[in-house]
Amino acid sequence: MRYLKRLSWYISILILIVVIAGCGKGNETKEGSKEEQIKKSFAKTLDMYPIKNLEDLYDKEGYRDSEFKKSDKGTWTIYTDFAKSNKPGELDDEGMVLNLDRNTRTAKGHYFVTTFYRNGKLPDEKNYKIEMKNNKIILLDEVKDDKLKQKIENFKFFGQYANLKELRKYNNGDVSINENVPSYDVEYKMSNKDEIVKELRSRYNISTEKSPILKMHIDGDLKGSSVGYRKLEIDFSKRENSKLSVIEFLSYKPAKK
């Protein structure tokens, strides 16, 4: 009889634990999991895409915190690069960064062509100064290579053509968190049928049939911070020791120090 009472007591405790755990899970769903919080944090920026006319950013204000002076309208920075391993032990990285100062309504930056080496050799890096006027990239440095010159002058940032509404359908991603930094990452396997995947294959002549991985990274507070940053990467890499990806970020920082 004592055995049955003890068994009944154990079962009651077990049921109570399961109920409490279930309630905790429900609360997490209600409040939003870390995955959902990361997606919502990215949505604040990605919902602005596509930004066909980058000069529209002069009239848009991002997240402001105590780092901003009251009179400072801030600076938007948009960045896109295409990284590819063309040779073993080498990584070619090519793209553009543009800073749009809302105080002066001027946009300056550079186009970069960089080769990184794994053997400890210093990278080969070339930067070409640019500015933007009337939503058009103007090359400020002399470039003798006509093909490169046209590539720079006709360059389009990922954020100018990307429609990322499809990202909302992605769920159950691989999430990793470092609370000490803090930093947050989530990864999703994309579909080759996604319009943005088709667009990138066309623009960068990506021949691999492998479905890419979408990587979303946040450094800083999920609610927003002018100190941290958000980076989006679409990774087409076939193998661990090779690289084939497009990286994009759009940030809003104080213009005045």
UniProtKB/Swiss-Prot annotation:
Keywords: Cell membrane, Lipoprotein, Membrane, Palmitate, Signal. It is a lipid-anchor. It is found in: Cell membrane. A lipid is attached at residue 23 (S-diacylglycerol cysteine). This is Uncharacterized lipoprotein SA0396. GO terms for cellular component: plasma membrane. Its main location: membrane. InterPro entries: Csa, Csa_sf. Pfam families: DUF576. Belongs to the staphylococcal tandem lipoprotein family. A lipid is attached at residue 23 (N-palmitoyl cysteine). Residues 1-22 form the signal peptide. The keyword Acyltransferase does not apply. It comes from Staphylococcus aureus (strain N315).
